[in-house]
């Protein structure tokens, strides 16, 4: 029997790198030294719960979202401990892009272990709609709940006046993750004749690749990785975010753009499909995304329409209040 002593949802990444972090008082203030309340941390933050790497502490919560990571061995051990404490255990993939999951489960032993864990879990929670068929093949209790964003909290509103927004922010960073289509989106951006900003995470090799595009000297700004608040401040100074990502991920870049109140064109992640129905890349060609980008750059009325739609749709479907409502419907002990 579980004698829960801690409130909210515990999100457990057993043995992971992120340190234990309490969200007892909600999302808090933007900070350069702690993990922001986004992605899987957001599930904890919107319920005033906590994110853990320690199974023993997570077991003090009534409901736990266990992240399936690596070869699943640590996740399996954590699952057994949590169930022995009487916790309600939901499971989700730590890296939930479709290609990431396919790679993780490519070995027969891992796939069998996944089936054992997921079929025994109280709930399979997917941050993307694309993994629902996989979960549904082993469990009758599956649900897609997109990762929420602290849109209703003033400290997390990074919006700037429209007349202070210039150019395009490239949402992807990695050349070597082929589903990101980073090379293709930069090639398209090269033709726009507007300021372009890109974050380089690949050091000198990335710089060589970026310089090979031969952008005009005053068009391309290359920035190293930044702390999250500085990254949002940089993004917010642009008219839009552009990406050709086809990784079927939860959609953190699109969520980041929501905090900046600027539209994202492209990307087929969960957040893109919800927040930007007229702009996402699910089922649209790269040519169509290029045309939408040009429309947003040059048609002020269309741009204003997308901003208005962003505010309405995002708050209705992706706010912390909506996240709490959705999670409470499926997991006990959150309210």
Model region roles, listed by residue range:
Residues 122-157:
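Donor nucleotide-sugar binding/catalytic pocket of nucleotide-sugar-dependent glycosyltransferases
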Residues 297-334:
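A charged, aromatic-enriched C-terminal amphipathic alpha-helix characteristic of glycosyltransferases
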């Amino acid at each position: 029997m579980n004698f829960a002593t801690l409130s909210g949802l515990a999100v457990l990444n057993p043995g992971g790198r992120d340190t234990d972090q309490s969200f007892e008082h909600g999302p808090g203030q933007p900070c350069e030294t702690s993990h922001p309340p986004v992605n899987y941390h957001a599930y904890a933050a919107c319920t005033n719960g906590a994110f853990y790497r320690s199974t023993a502490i997570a077991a003090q919560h009534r409901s736990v979202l266990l992240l399936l990571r690596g070869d699943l061995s640590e996740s399996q051990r954590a699952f057994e401990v949590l169930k022995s404490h009487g916790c309600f255990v939901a499971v989700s993939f730590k890296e939930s892009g479709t290609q990431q999951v396919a790679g993780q489960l490519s070995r027969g032993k891992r796939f069998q272990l996944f089936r054992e864990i997921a079929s025994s879990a109280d709930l399979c929670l997917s941050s993307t709609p694309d993994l629902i068929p996989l979960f549904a093949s082993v469990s009758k209790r599956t649900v897609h709940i997109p990762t929420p964003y602290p849109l209703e909290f003033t400290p997390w509103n990074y919006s700037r006046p429209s007349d202070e927004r210039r150019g395009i922010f490239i949402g992807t960073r990695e050349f070597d993750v082929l589903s990101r289509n980073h090379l293709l989106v930069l090639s398209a951006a090269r033709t726009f004749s507007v300021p372009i900003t890109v974050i380089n995470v690949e050091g000198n090799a990335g710089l060589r690749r970026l310089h090979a595009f031969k952008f005009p000297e005053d068009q391309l700004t290359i920035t190293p990785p930044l702390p999250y608040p500085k990254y949002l401040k940089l993004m917010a100074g642009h008219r839009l975010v552009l990406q050709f990502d086809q990784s079927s991920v939860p959609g953190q870049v699109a969520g980041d753009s929501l905090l900046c109140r600027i539209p994202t064109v492209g990307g087929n992640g969960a957040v893109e499909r919800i927040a930007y129905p007229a702009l996402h890349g699910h089922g649209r060609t790269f040519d169509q995304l290029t045309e939408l980008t040009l429309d947003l750059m040059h048609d002020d009325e269309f741009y204003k329409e997308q901003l208005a739609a962003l505010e309405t749709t995002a708050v209705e479907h992706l706010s912390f209040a909506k996240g709490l409502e959705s999670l409470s419907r499926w997991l006990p002990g959150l309210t």
